[in-house]
UniProtKB/Swiss-Prot annotation:
Entries under PANTHER family matching the protein: ORGANIC SOLUTE TRANSPORTER SUBUNIT BETA-RELATED (PTHR36129), PTHR36129:SF3
Topology class, membrane: Single-pass type I membrane protein
Protein's recorded name: Organic solute transporter subunit beta
Localisation per UniProt entry: Cell membrane
GO terms, molecular function: protein heterodimerization activity; transmembrane transporter activity
Stated role: Essential component of the Ost-alpha/Ost-beta complex, a heterodimer that acts as the intestinal basolateral transporter responsible for bile acid export from enterocytes into portal blood. Efficiently transports the major species of bile acids. May modulate slc51a glycosylation, membrane trafficking and stability activities. Able to transport taurocholate, estrone sulfate, digoxin, and prostaglandin E(2), but not p-aminohippurate or S-dinitrophenyl glutathione.
Any one GO biological process: positive regulation of protein glycosylation
Glycosylation (residues): 42, 48
Assembly description: Interacts with slc51a. The Ost-alpha/Ost-beta complex is a heterodimer composed of alpha (slc51a) and beta (slc51b) subunit; may induce the transport of slc51a from the endoplasmic reticulum to the plasma membrane.
Keyword Transport: yes
Length: 182
């Protein structure tokens, strides 16, 4: 950064040295006419020399630079979109690898839970207790079985949940039908 500051400071000093006197100060006004005429001649000479310098270094048409910067902007925009596309593709493949790896982990976890359940079943001494635990699990009944075993009053509407209670009765989980009024 200090190199950039040195460069800018050098350019500033160079501009100050090359700048010609273009305005009259109060000191030149108070001088006699003879010295003013001499200074005017010197100033016109300086103007002629700066004009000669300007002619030796003519100003270029800035449209070339404008087109170059415009082309550079399009190249940078293209590169930015290219990097964005590569980044999204890399993220997608990383997610797919993570999902495939997680699927393998889930299979091993399922195997370990099955082994733990088998050990638990082996540890249970009383078979009657095991049978009682298995019977207390909720059972799921399809709608066809419910329609065959129960009266026509129990047919469910859309969105209603049928439950078989421990006493053997089949009924709806929610008896409140506030949505029917709407």
């Amino acid at each position: 950064m200090s190199g950039l500051l040195k460069y800018l400071f050098g350019c500033f000093i160079l501009c100050l040295l090359l700048q010609g006197k273009t305005h009259m100060t109060s000191a030149t006004i108070s001088k006699p006419h003879e010295t003013i005429d001499i200074e005017k001649q010197n100033m016109t000479g300086e103007r002629n020399s700066t004009l000669a310098q300007q002619l030796s270094f003519p100003m270029e048409d800035p449209t070339n630079w404008n087109y170059a910067i415009l082309a550079l902007a399009f190249v940078v925009l293209f590169l930015a979109f290219l990097i964005l596309a590569q980044n999204s593709r890399a993220n997608r493949t990383r997610k797919m690898k993570a999902l495939n790896g997680a699927g393998g982990r889930n299979e091993t976890e399922a195997d370990s839970t099955q082994k733990a359940m088998m050990q638990y079943v082996v540890e249970v001494d009383n078979l009657a207790e095991t049978d009682q635990m298995l019977q207390s699990k909720p059972t799921y009944i399809s709608l066809n079985q419910v329609a065959q075993t129960s009266s026509p009053k129990v047919l469910p509407k859309e969105g209603q949940i049928l439950v078989e209670w421990k006493d053997g009765n089949i009924g709806f989980l929610y008896t409140d039908s506030k949505e029917d009024d709407v």
